[in-house]
Amino acid sequence: MKIRCLILLCLALILINYDSHAGKPADQEEVHGLHLVHGRRTMKIPFELRSNLIIVPVRINKSEVLRFILDTGVGPTILTDAAIAQKLGMKSIRTMKIDGIGKGEAIPADITIGNRLTMGAMQSLKHNIVVLDSDILRLSELVGTSIHGIFGYEVFNKFVVTIDFQRQLLTLTVPKKYEYSAKQGDRFPIVIEKTKPYLEGITVVNNDTELPIRVVLDTGAGHALMLNTTTNNVQLPQKVMKAQLGVGLGGVINGHIGRIPKVRIGEYELTDVLTTFPDSNAFGMKIATNAPQREGNLGGEFLRRFKVTFNYDAGYVVLKPNKKRFYDKFEHDMSGMDVRAKGMNFRQYYVEHILEGSPAHFAGLQENDELLFINNQSVEDLEMAELNRILQQKEGKEMRLVIRRNGRLVLANFALKRMI
């Protein structure tokens, strides 16, 4: 269930190349681009961490507080709810097509100009925002709370950004006022290409072979590691399972899930890392010929094990291990069902997909079943993250479900199984 959310963002927007300040003089960007109000040098703002995604409070023009995902993998600011743009009277100057990963066609979107965007003490007075014509991503259903949009590069390019996953605190600092010290962690060089941060100092050990790779550091992907088998030397592990990895702007993303025995960054080493491998038809075939070379990306399930500081201006990232989370096991759903959250408060859970040969499959669960109770607990009392944890607790753990199917109550029982 979790992987659908985990891989979605790193793939869905990978082909967007749009400069929200294109054509603006440098001095005008200083006035109207992202900045901290009242000459502040730094600001802190709490964030929510859901499904390993960073969710921050944002306002557009005179809107109520909106929830945006902070995503290093996306270039422009994207509003996924066209109804909000219409309500706010956002001015569209032209339409565009967004090509995504998957089997579908390009998605229409509008480019709006002259917007005021604020996040705490950060603001932009004339901000360009891309508005999707339809909510094809369905991010709210995946995360289990209202999600209204995504942004990233414009923030990371303007400030030194420190993400404290343990305290769920985001710090923005004006680059000229930021000073690095060794106690903040180890520095690793990154290169910014086409709005994305690339890290080269990483090694994976797979099938008894050490392989240096180049990856995107992607805070908008909830998974741990994604590898692209269409590039040289990247191979599937000996044990993998086929899976529907997610749904991007272009449709369904299929592939495999496996484990990489070791992933090493400098002196830091993590083992048995859960890794996704998108099919070449869904991933490699759609990468533009002039796209920067890479073997994959590191997402939130990996990054949350560190306190992370991105310094695009100086060209490095700082990693400091989170002692409480660094050695957490990488676990995948053990039920075999993907679930979507719906309803007013996103506390109604429906089965979206059943993995063939999984415990849920053998127990007779079907797509569109509504979960009502799990082990005598009403699912209305559970957030999506809590439900995810229940379904990946422990191999052999018995699950007793009450579901609604076509207006009838149905009982289903199965034991969790570690399928990968």
Descriptions of predicted regions:
Residues 5, 18-420:
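Pepsin/retropepsin-fold aspartyl endopeptidases
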Residues 7-14:
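Bacterial N-terminal signal peptides
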Residues 1-7:
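Bacterial N-terminal signal peptides that target proteins for export
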